[in-house]
Each structure stands twice: as C-alpha cells, then as structure tokens.
Amino acid sequence: MHKSLIALAILSTAAHADEGMWMPQQLPQVAKQLKAAGLKLDPANLTKLTEFPMGAIVSLGGCSASFVSPQGLVATNHHCVYGSVAHNSTPERDLLANGFLAHNFGEELPAAPGSRIFVTKAVTDVSKQVVTADVAKLSGKKRSDAIEKNQKSIQAECEKDQGHRCTVSSYYGGLEYYLIKQLEIRDVRLVHAPPAGVGKFGGDTDNWMWPRHTGDYGFYRAYVSKDGKAADFSKDNVPYIPQHYLKLAKEGSKEGDFIMVLGYPGRTNRHRLPSEVAYTFDWSYPTFVKTSAENLAIIADTTKDNKDTALKYASQVASINNYYKNRQGMLDSYAGSDMLQRKTAEHEALKSWINANPARKAEYAGDIELVEKLIAQRDAETKRDYFLSSSKPRLLNTARTLYRLANENTKPDAERKSGFQVRDVPRIKSSVAALVRNYDEKVDQALVINSLSKYAALPAAQRNADFDAIIGIKDGMSKADLQAVLDTMYAGSKLGDAAERTSWIGKTPADFKASNDAFIKAAVAMYESDMKEEAQEEELGGKLQQAYANYMKAKIAFMQSKGQAVYPDANGTLRVTFGQIAGRDHGADGTTWKAFTTVEGVAAKATGVGEFNAPQAQLAAIKAKDFGKYLDPKLKSVPVAYLATLDITGGNSGSAALNAKGEWIGLAFDGILDSIISDWDFNKANTRDIQVDLRYILWNMKHVDHADNLLKEMKAE
C-alpha cells in the first residue's frame, strides 16, 4: 500500500520539475520530466544506490559530500569541515585563518571527534514491520514503545553486517518507514581547507545573499583497516577505495544547462498544519532570533580577549549566525506573504473533501480534529519549557547523559533506550571527548545565567518544581543569587577535566550515586524527573504519530484527487532534486541577477580585513588574469558561483552538483534569503540555490592553495 501511494502520487504530478526532493526509488516515475529537463543518463540508474553516480554520494551526518577519487577523497563544503578545522586549530597554528593542506597521506589530520562518512547501500520499505497489525491497535506510550522496539529489532538485524549503521526513518509523519543501510566509515581525516579568506569569504554579511563569491569547499579522506573494513582511527589504516567516484566535468557550465543535486537534505515542513505554521512564525522563530542574538553577543564578549577560547567557539558561532540569519530571513518573507491564509484555505479544503464522503469522513475526520488538539498541546509544552532547556550547564547535561548510559547498561541491549545502545556508545564517547576543544567554563556560565535568570523570573506554576528543588531556585532570586548557585555547582565539579569526564563512561549507577561531584549529584537527583517527563512526551508522541500518519494519508489522497505531486518532506535521507542553471530577473535587491559571479567580484569586494580578507596570492592571480584552462570564454573570467532552480535545504550543504551526463560541476552551499521560506512554502519564481563552481575550486587549488597533489589525484592535471 505504501509504495503504491508514492507511485500514484507522482504519476499524477502537475508540479514544476524544479520542485521536489525525490527519493531515489521515485525517479523512474518522473523520468519524462528528467528527460525533458535535459538529463542524458537513464533515470533508472539513479535508483541503483551502489552504482554510478549514486554510489559516489555520501553523508557526513549533517552535511552531504561525494567521493571524487579512487583513494577515498571526499569533497564537501568548507563550512562542513569547519568544525574539524577549528578542532585542529590553536592560537599558534590557526588553520581557520590560514587554511590547511596535506601534501601526502601522512600529513592528514584526524577530523573532529565523532566525524563519520556514511555510504548508503540500501533503502527498504519496512512500514509493515514497524507498524504491525498489533501496533496499529495501540495508542500513546504503548504505541511509541512498540514502534521503537520494532525499529531497534530491524536495525539490530541489519547491523549484523558489521561496519554498517542502519536507521529506520519515518516519512509522511509516520505513515511510512524505511530502513536506511549505510556503510559507516569511522576514520575520517582532514585533507584540505582553504583559508578563511576563500572558504568563508563574505562571512555572515554575504551569507544567504547574491551575488556571492565564497569558495565554500573542503576535503576529507575516508580510511579503513587494511582488510577494507570500517575501523576506528589507526596509523595502520589505509584510504578507502570507493566503488564509484565522481568525474570532473569536461566542459564548463552555462546558463540554461540541466543540473541535479544529490544529497541529504535535513528538514522541510511543507506538509505542516496551519496551526504549526502560526506557532513557528509567531513565536518559535522570533524567540529563536532574539535568543540567538543574545547568545552571539555573550560569546563575543566572553571570548574577545582569549584567542584560544574564540577558536573553541568558532564553529558554534558560525552555526548560530547561520540559523539566526536564516530564521530572520524566513520571518521577513512570511511577514509579506499570504502563506498562513493559503495553508488555512488548503486545510479547510481538505476537511471539506473528507466530510463530503461518508467513508472518508469515517476514516479521517476524527484524526484530523485530534491532530490539531495534540499539536496545540505539544506547542504549549514547548513554550513552557523553552528557557528551562537552555538553563542547564553543559557539564550537567553531560553528567545526565553519562548517568543515563550507566542505567541503560544494566539492561539487555535490545531493551535499552534508543541512543544508549551499544551501537551508540562511540558517539557518546566522541561527544564527551569533543568538549576539550568546544567548551569553556566562563563562556558556558555566561550563556546559562542569561537563560536561567529568565527561567527563574517565571511564575512558580510555569517552572519545573523538581529542577528548582535540585538546583536551589526559589521565587524572588536575583541574578546575583542565581550566579552564586552556579558558582557553587561549577566549583564543586571536576567534570571540566577531560580525563575525569571520560572516566565516568562505563561506571555503574552505584558509582554515580556515591559521587560528591556537584554535577553528578544533580544528574542523579534529576533522573527520576527526567524519566517521568520522557514518559509524558512518549505518551503524547504516540498519540500524535497515530493521528498525524492518518492526517498525511488523507492529505496524500486529497492531493492525488487534484492531480498534485506528493513527495515526503526532507528528513535527512538521500534525495535528488533537478532544475537548471538560471539567474533571476527580479532579484531581492531590485536588480536583475546574472546566473554567474566571477573572480573580479572577489577583487572588488576584498578589503584586506575581516570577512573580506582575500589572500594576496589570489588577488595577484586575478589581477594578472592568470586563469589558464579555467577561463570561461563567454564570461572572460573564472566563474566563482552560480544560481540554479534547485529545491534544497540545510543538510544539502556539500552536495555534488552534476550536469546532464552525471559529471561533477560544483558544490551546493547556500540558498537565497528571500526564498529560504521554501522550506515551508515552495516558491517557484524566487527559489534559487547557490553552487560554488568547480572551475573556481580547481583554479583556487592551483593558484592559491598549490594543492597539486590533490589536483593530480582528481585527474584535474
């Protein structure tokens, strides 16, 4: 039934081909659109995950990437390797500012703790195994528990094939479930990242903007044991040999060319209810923007006199800035739109369609009403707990994770909570280890006190009584009183020491209960309350999954009846989007946007300082017009970036852009500020994404980075 829903929805498509984040197995159903758009490959080949080109596409667990050589070289965005560059940077060796290039395998650096490369091997519909006939009869927490149990069982069976990570992902609000089987490469090394003056050129000023001149590229390498199996970092490991890797385009791209992007988009919200739209744009995003601005100011103030601390928080600052501007851009677009009115009208039309037929009314009407009530309950609880969630010191949250792990370790693995099974321990260890280079007590205290003071000012009825009692929060406490409470907690803990943190992994609940460490004691005291809250969330989650899945079933049937396309919202799994390279004749700044930018734009923007500090070697090469074979005859220059009519979102960063022949032509790295609201409401006229042109990457590697070894490896020389 589930596969037929997808197939029928696509066969009746009336949507423009540029819209849609298609699952690979859906592509044969849009073969006519793909061919009409200009694809030269057989669309059926794109469904074969272990063949070319899909076999070259990988996930970094938050970004997308691709194999680009037979020796496991992986191309992605600079901002996707940023955390690893920051992790390896010190005041004496500032790789963020100066860039990094390994001239041979021996010079490559371990990526940040927890870094992974995931190669998708199979996607299988397991909907009937997850929501069995027995599960379908359940509701609330019993339903949540049963679904989780089935997911864990399916994943465990899949992971008997050692070296693989298997995940059961939900689609269409829990209507369908697919098993994603991925090779998990655990030894990831940093190979190359350009200087910040290239990879982050324009900084937050140019982020989400056009025209753009950012060289947003970087390289990792995948390593495995000598027998070719996934393994932890070891000097004895060897480069992974992928079955497939991308070939460099033989010809440059031009406006009007077919383009497709293969990657792992994170989240979109196009199937959300009107109440979810209103909640997000009236409260959630505005609150996020306000809080982000405060946090950025706090981090800037507490790190301004300490370069090492600033480096520790560089990746977090970049992330906050990115989402701050993203959310503000969405709010600006929403303010001038009729999106809520249209979503409301569409939802009312759905309900009218359901009520017009007795059979449909019997099947769907109750769940449509219920899902609206459950969403209202969920959103109210999120509002209530907003400041509480950010009022806990990072070391306290670390202690809570470690104590939870200790308790889960007393159970058989199949009975442990997802996230705390044996398969999850390496991730937890990496997270604990990463604190060495992304945590500072002074900064953490400043962030926590800002949130805690807001939380403590709430009426007692809106606060968490258990948390208050454990931490020592009372009505009427001043900021100074709260700071004194925090000072005592931080001073009473040794978890700021890396060795001390690591030592708690594997200890028993009794060890935790016997500890006098302030954060450990607080974690133990909070455990019962945490479990109670989790059970309440699962009770609501089980009800919501049941109602939301039926809502989506109704919506799919309704859209089919109107001849509209139905593709699932992005959920971090492999997708394909296609369109064409194209400018915009109505740019957000009131001008016509050309499809390409060139290196002359870099020189024009370069100031020699801050976000626009282009390397002198690059500026000299531009001035001398030393373009070589990367010259575009029509542009009479080297293209830096280009616009395309592709449907992407966060998570697509680092995705390979391919031409009609499946050749590599660039890397997707950003969207346009006035069109990122397409995460919620696709806008065909405005939506554009930005790719860094492969020719700019190669030209820069040749003339600025002098990465001749990598150019040779990729057969660019």
Where are these regions (language model features)?
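Terminal presequence/propeptide segments associated with secretion/organelle targeting
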Residues: H2, S12-E717
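Sec-dependent signal peptide recognition
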Residues: M1-A7
